[in-house]
């Protein structure tokens, strides 16, 4: 298969084809089975996180080092020239990309990754999250996890639960799965946190089936994947938050009618939307999902920085 990802900016999921997504998933599986310690030998990757991150930053840096690459960068913008001296993001990107073979960036501003790609002098930019916009590498690890647990990416029933309005992970994953055949979505959220209209309109245009469901219990018996998200407390007053939160807590009891193959995923961190009693069920897969972030990011970096593998 031709590697069309070589030297490509990874900014958003809609810009990746089904074939490219499958190539990343396939490569992640190979690397998980057979580690490749030299694929980034003599490569330098800039890891620049302008806002806090634990799993994404550490899994990227682990991925780089396990492939034999070197990491430069920062985990907070507070001590950079950008913050201390008023340097523009464009200037910062131009300088840092001159030092590195790839530029991994998380930024609170929507569109920051695309801006970076315009000033990177051809150095590939990988979006590690830009505000509430896109988080493509989370989607890649989600796709790999779904494939690992289900053996396919076609013909799946997938539910998203919780904050579907602001949750960039569910937006990106919906757009990715929409590239495959026979997908049916269940969107389970309070009206104030419903899936954005533009996502539903995209699905309508593609003729993809989806249902707006009020209760998890109504959907669970049909599901292959149950993707939980955190309802963000800061968006509600106390009484409203307490009501909404209680309606979207998953317990082991909820999973009793589930299919044997159902897996529960979560981008983490969880607060209390998944009871700890779920952890001991065969359906829980969110910790393995987080671990898969390393393999998915290894695959992406290897493909972006190597014309052939």
From Swiss-Prot:
Its EC number is 2.1.3.2. Pathway: Pyrimidine metabolism; UMP biosynthesis via de novo pathway; (S)-dihydroorotate from bicarbonate: step 2/3. L-aspartate binds at residues 85, 168, 230. Carbamoyl phosphate binds at residues 55-56, 106, 135, 138, 268-269. It catalyses: carbamoyl phosphate + L-aspartate = N-carbamoyl-L-aspartate + phosphate + H(+). GO terms for molecular function: amino acid binding; aspartate carbamoyltransferase activity. The keyword Transferase applies. GO terms for biological process: 'de novo' pyrimidine nucleobase biosynthetic process; 'de novo' UMP biosynthetic process; amino acid metabolic process. It is an enzyme of class 2 (transferase). One of its GO terms (cellular component) is cytosol. Keywords: Pyrimidine biosynthesis, Transferase. NCBIfam families: asp_carb_tr (TIGR00670), PRK00856.1 (NF002032). Belongs to the aspartate/ornithine carbamoyltransferase superfamily. ATCase family. Catalyzes the condensation of carbamoyl phosphate and aspartate to form carbamoyl aspartate and inorganic phosphate, the committed step in the de novo pyrimidine nucleotide biosynthesis pathway. Heterododecamer (2C3:3R2) of six catalytic PyrB chains organized as two trimers (C3), and six regulatory PyrI chains organized as three dimers (R2). PANTHER family: ASPARTATE CARBAMOYLTRANSFERASE, ORNITHINE CARBAMOYLTRANSFERASE, MITOCHONDRIAL. This is Aspartate carbamoyltransferase catalytic subunit. It comes from Aliivibrio fischeri (strain ATCC 700601 / ES114) (Vibrio fischeri). The gene is pyrB.
